[in-house]
Every structure is written in structure tokens, then in C-alpha cells.
């Protein structure tokens, strides 16, 4: 992304000059990302932590360097942190305020909808092997929230995984980002018709159907759609096979549609973070984007798509449960868990002679 280019440049120059370049370039990710938003996130996290009792706080907070920070997943399993289920009438509003700060209004709505699907699964599964509970979603803090130091927040549970990492004055990152939906479409009960990821599915299918035969031959990969996202819950990922139709091979209208898909998937995040991601994609060159599809093209067909650029990967898979179960992830090759900004942060501290141990 845009921040990665600057990171590589800054490694080669003295700290004072590097800091000057950072301030002049005013990258949306690191500098504008925005201090006001960062301050709001710090305040919301602090208020939430202050609402916890000593025992809860001990479980909610880890050292920033703890291995647990990278231990992410999207399946129903036991987790570290404090769950929404155990919060009282004073604490729960603080957690809600925190999530509304870290997510866009649409993102918060989607998280609530994903949680509501746990009730649907509880109703339709017979002798299910997983515990289904809309309140088994956990908040975990790593480090001490501040503008100067490094810290992180994780919000995670079945089919939700959000990771925000703050690297001192260098900014914040917001991946891995995962949202899933099971069922993808609710077909019975009070929530009949709910499709949490409708736009993310429909926009991509519309792009697929707009392709000519010649374009489709490039965009649609042979074989069946994979049974899940290829990168799974890997802690670090690299680019997948360079396949699919390239941005320059699309018409202007199709190019716009591709960018709409990307922005829609980013838009669970606050507007400032969305703007940073889109700016980074454009800085790395939209001509380097590729869109690939596997599986059938009709609603109800098992299918998979991915969008890949030099610095990021989006994977979408809807094959499980008779193609009614979506997994959708956004990964950043350099920036997941703040790796790029943390390297820059530690280098800057070291060059300033402050002797950071990392």
C-alpha cells in the first residue's frame, strides 16, 4: 500500500529527515489517520477498560508483544479477552461505544447482524457441535492505549475478526479483517431474507456477468471453487497466484464496478481508514489489480472470487452449506497486524537513540 512505499524509503535515510518527509507527505494511513480518529479510539478503549473490574481487566489486557496478538481466527472456539456476555449494564454501553468508534455505521450494523445469525444457527442446527451465542464475542487489548506507544485492539468471535494496530505516531493499520455470514441468506424464521453480505456478493456477480466471452476466459479460473478462503487464518500471507483479469482489460464501467467492490468491502471501517486504503491502492497502481472468479455464476452456485493488488488481497468464498455460507477476508501483505508501521516506528525510535528493544 502507499505506506509501504514510504516505509522502504524511510529505512534508508536518517530519522530527522524521515520524520520531515512523513510530515510533508501527510499519508492518510499514518499521519492523517487521522489523529482525531486515533484519539477517539484511544478514549473509547480507555473508557471501556476503566469500566471493567480488576479480574476482567486482567483478562482483557495483554502485553503488546504477547503471542496472543497474532492468534486470530474466525471459527467458533474459545478466545482470550472479555466477552460481551459477561458485561453488566454499565460496561456493555462502553463496549458498544467502543465498537461504534472503531467501525463505520455500516460496519457496526453488519457485526450486529452477524451476531444475530448465531440465534438462527441455534434454531436450525440439530445436535450442533458448536456453542451458538450472539454474546460470545470478545474484546482484547494489547499494550496501553496512547498516541505515543504501540498497542492494538481485537474484536473477535464466530465470523468476525477485526484487528487494529497502532504504531505510535506512525499511524494505524486495520487488517486482518474478516466478516462471514452463515447462513448467507436466512430462509426461515424472524430474520427471513437477511443477507449480511448481499452487496459484497451481488456487486461481484454483476461484474462477472458484464464480462464478454473473451474477458470471461481470462477472469474465470478452471475447476471448482475452493472449499474456503485459501489463506485461511494464516498469521502472515503473501500474494496468491497472479491470475485473473487485469484492470486495464476491463471497460471503464467495469473498472468502476471493481473499485466499488473493493470500497464496499473496506467500508466496514471508518471513512478515514477506507480513504487510506483506497489511496494506497491507487498509489500502487490500479493497473496492477486483478479479479478472478471460480465456480458458477448464478445465485446459489458455489463460487469464489478474489481481488489482488501488489499490497493486498481480498478473498471471498461461498461454497459451504450448499453455497449459503460466506467467508470474506481482507489481508495486507506488509501491513497485517501493523508489521510495516511497527518496523518504521521501531527504526525511528532506534535512530533517535532511544534504544527500543525490538
Model-derived regions, located:
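Bacterial N-terminal signal peptides that target proteins for export
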Residues: 2-15
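Short, intrinsically disordered low-complexity segments
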Residues: 7-10, 25, 342
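Bacterial N-terminal signal peptides
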Residues: 12-24
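Signal peptide processing junction and immediate N-terminal pro/mature segment
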Residues: 25-31
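A cross-kingdom marker for long, charged
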Residues: 31-104, 108-358
Amino acid at each position: 500500500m502507499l505506506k509501504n512505499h514510504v516505509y522502504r524509503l524511510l529505512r534508508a535515510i536518517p530519522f530527522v529527515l524521515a520524520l520531515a518527509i512523513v510530515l510533508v507527505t501527510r499519508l492518510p494511513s499514518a499521519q492523517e489517520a487521522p489523529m482525531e480518529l486515533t484519539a477517539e479510539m484511544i478514549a473509547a478503549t480507555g473508557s471501556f477498560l476503566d469500566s471493567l473490574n480488576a479480574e476482567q481487566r486482567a483478562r482483557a489486557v495483554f502485553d503488546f508483544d504477547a503471542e496472543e496478538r497474532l492468534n486470530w481466527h474466525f471459527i467458533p472456539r474459545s478466545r482470550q479477552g472479555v466477552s460481551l456476555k459477561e458485561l453488566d449494564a454499565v460496561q456493555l454501553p462502553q463496549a458498544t461505544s467502543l465498537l461504534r468508534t472503531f467501525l463505520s455505521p455500516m460496519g457496526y450494523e453488519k457485526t450486529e447482524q452477524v451476531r444475530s445469525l448465531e440465534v438462527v444457527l441455534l434454531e436450525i442446527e440439530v445436535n450442533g457441535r458448536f456453542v451458538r451465542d450472539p454474546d460470545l464475542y470478545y474484546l482484547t487489548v494489547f499494550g496501553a492505549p496512547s498516541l505515543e506507544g504501540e498497542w492494538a485492539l481485537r474484536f473477535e468471535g464466530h465470523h468476525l475478526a477485526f484487528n487494529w494496530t497502532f504504531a505510535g505516531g506512525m499511524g494505524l493499520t486495520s487488517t486482518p479483517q474478516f466478516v462471514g455470514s452463515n447462513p448467507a441468506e436466512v430462509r426461515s424464521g424472524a430474520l427471513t431474507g437477511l443477507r449480511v453480505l448481499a452487496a459484497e456478493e451481488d456487486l461481484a456477480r454483476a461484474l462477472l456477468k458484464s464480462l464478454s466471452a473473451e474477458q470471461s476466459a481470462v477472469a474465470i479460473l478452471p475447476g471448482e471453487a475452493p472449499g474456503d478462503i485459501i489463506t485461511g487464518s494464516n498469521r502472515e500471507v503473501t500474494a496468491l497466484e497472479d491470475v485473473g483479469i487485469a484492470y486495464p482489460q476491463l471497460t471503464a464501467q467495469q473498472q468502476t464496478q471493481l473499485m466499488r467492490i473493493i470500497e464496499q468491502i473496506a467500508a466496514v471501517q471508518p471513512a478515514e481508514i477506507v480513504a487510506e486504503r483506497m489511496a494506497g491502492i491507487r498509489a500502487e497502481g490500479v493497473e496492477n489489480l486483478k479479479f478472478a472468479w471460480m465456480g458458477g455464476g448464478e445465485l446459489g452456485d458455489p463460487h469464489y472470487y478474489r481481488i489482488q493488488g501488489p499490497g493486498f488481497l481480498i478473498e471471498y468464498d461461498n461454497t459451504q452449506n450448499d453455497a449459503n455460507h460466506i467467508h470474506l477476508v481482507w489481508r495486507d501483505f506488509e501491513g497485517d497486524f501493523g508489521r510495516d508501521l511497527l518496523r518504521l516506528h521501531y527504526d525511528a525510535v532506534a535512530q533517535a537513540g532511544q534504544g527500543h528493544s525490538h
